[in-house]
């Protein structure tokens, strides 16, 4: 329940601008300025209670408490490591990024690329901090997280061994911005060890809020050089790596001194005149620093002697910093994949710079409710979250073209908070999405999920080529104008997870989550049915009614259990007393806590209707319905509910094996009827909103 309330609170805060880079969320409620002032007033250096300098901050396995790798580690402040520590020395540069004993080269490559764009850098690394004025042992950084910016506060105690920083450090021994940035990112993800292993674009996106694309260099686009050049000019961040065929090859060094599975950052491209012909060059950087490419165009390679000496002086900087040049043709041969985090994605496909429009959806895959798996599982696939976008305006550069006009969209599906789960053995889920064009007759269909039959009848217009266990999968699609349904999913069903779905479109797109409507029109027996004489029913009622001709919750329990216990077509262990109390609460019109004959007859007819729906929805006649079938049952019962409510129902009423027995089903129906009835009574002006005091709200939810 607390999670649902927190989600509602976040949504309301976002509508008021909270979560922008200028108004970042305070991670764990810590405010940098307030905490720093408290430390300055008290004369005490900050010690972060939320990320203490202790073994748990290091890791949980290889860097866990008691691990040989963590023996001898001492946490020290920069003021204890050198006489005159500096936050940044001479501006932040790529050489400030030197890898330590943590396998987070992917992150370091992203940080190195970040230094190429000062505006981006200082969004992540605020300028208002140093070791001189107002120093209080506290620093702060900002990161993009799933659609919103968060401010992370840390103290400056860093893990050291033998007097040296253990992890990320700068070539300048007295410069600490990069080490502190790594610590803040470790805090955001739970610990340092959680940063081991990843994709460079993950860091790119968390530093910029951009969206990433991947290029397979075994099948490079013909205009690869132009793509890279324009991306760098647009301030985009680029990384590349060499794939390995087995774990044994990881970090292996090739004969020409390239490190396999290592994350390199792309820092520049140039074209030179080489022996009378243009030669395209690309500049890369290895965060390790010590290992550099030894092939053509490397430091001291003979190729440099055959170009204009002035160009050679400009480009050939002989520094052992891990940065080097190579030809574009060698780059394509040697590397496997290129990753680009687009800050202005349209600059890659058009000479003109346009501001793309962004639509952001947040959602959950909840086991038993909205975790339907991929198209290989048609029985549950349709229960995945569904989002609709409408594309009306075609791309500008195609409005006058002869071919079919199209709308370019860039889709990115990102799973949330998976690094936190590494410590409990849960890695990234395999995720993907599919895009379906909505037929004209269904374009106005937004109140409920499209069902199984739709997905059996229609094929996707665009989709991820494969499901992969990366934090984000993304891709471009060129679609004719129209209405489209986007379905994000995990590969296998019943996998819990959170996600955000981003849709960039060149022209503005209308967006709506399918099934976002909440409404209820439950079955009400006709008065003639209630008034109809039934001798058997009357004898049953009189048998358990008291002298006042009223039935209590205990009597109701006995009566109903006796009536339904003989059925063999449903699994029924009996109604519990709380369900019976809910029944009375719904129909007790005079507040006595009991039911009269007419009220009981109404209840009896409702339960018969619930039984009919339950039996119809139990497609495999197992005697129970599963949580995915519950969505259909609710619709049959007259309830239109959004995904959040569906997920809450699955969490509350389904058992561990995702089955819902008849008692739980009836309890859910009764509870929903009660809540809709209460809301309708309180919503006097019928605007879909009610305002209650705390006492009034408690009385309602405790009914």
Swiss-Prot record:
The cellular location(s) given in this protein's UniProt record come to: Cytoplasm; Golgi apparatus
Could you say which tissues express the protein in this record? Stomach.
Q: Could you mention a single GO BP entry for this protein?
A: proteolysis
State any GO CC term. cytoplasm
**What SMART domains does this protein's entry cite?**
calpain_III (SM00720), CysPc (SM00230)
Q: EC number(s) on record?
A: 3.4.22.53
Which residue ranges does the record annotate as region Domain III? 356-379
Cofactor comment text: Binds 2 calcium ions.
Residues engaged in binding Ca(2+) 1: 588, 590, 592, 594, 599
Gene Ontology molecular-function annotations: calcium ion binding; calcium-dependent cysteine-type endopeptidase activity
Its main localization is cytoplasm
Obligatory cofactor(s): Ca(2+)
Query: What positions does the entry give for Ca(2+) 2 binding?
Result: 618, 620, 622, 624, 629
Q: Which UniProt keywords apply?
A: Autocatalytic cleavage, Calcium, Cytoplasm, Golgi apparatus, Hydrolase, Metal-binding, Protease, Repeat, Thiol protease
Q: Which residues form the EF-hand domain?
A: 575-610, 618-640, 670-703
Catalyses which reaction? Answer: Broad endopeptidase specificity
Q: Pfam family of this protein, just one? A: Peptidase_C2
Could you describe the subunit structure of this protein?
Monomer and homooligomer. Interacts with COPS1/GPS1, COPB1, EYA2, NME2, NME4 and TOMM70.
Which family, according to UniProt?
Belongs to the peptidase C2 family.
Outline what the protein does.
Calcium-regulated non-lysosomal thiol-protease. Involved in membrane trafficking in the gastric surface mucus cells (pit cells) and may involve the membrane trafficking of mucus cells via interactions with coat protein. Proteolytically cleaves the beta-subunit of coatomer complex.
What protein is this chain from? Calpain-8
Source taxonomy: Eukaryota, Metazoa, Chordata, Craniata, Vertebrata
Q: What gene codes for this chain? A: CAPN8
